[in-house]
Amino acid sequence: RPWQMQSELSLMPLAVSVPIAMDAQHKFFRLKIPSSCISDPHIQFMSANSLNDRDVVVAISQSGNTAALVESIKTVKSFGVIVIGLMPSNTPLSRICDISLDIDVGENARLTRPLTSRLAYMAIIDVLAVGVAQLKPEAQDHLFNIVTSQNSLKLK
């Protein structure tokens, strides 16, 4: 149960997967889970060296074949960190993740692929966030407090 032993959540995307990871960071932050989105491969590698076996990394890749991300995740795993991967099945990244959430959108058109893939990935992130919120009642209270406190920021 990675969400129960987690002390920090690091999201590691590259390129077109970055907005998806930023959305995930926002969702988990609102659930009172310390999270960061690290989209630079060099910083991913350096961050990997500061993680421990209580941390969780979510690797996000729409190809699953990016060498820099695969190398960062190999380093992360060498420190005993649990890695959850969101990527297509049967890719180098899917083969090294502890938990693979394979997302195969089955499309070839370059014009529609980014949109369809992004929607599929964001739906999975939403499901994960709801699942975590259900496991952590205190997260639900925190989310309610955040939403309520934002009312003062709105124009009347």
Put a short name on every predicted segment.
Residues 2-123, 127-136:
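Glycine-rich phosphate-binding loops that contact phosphosugars or nucleotide phosphates
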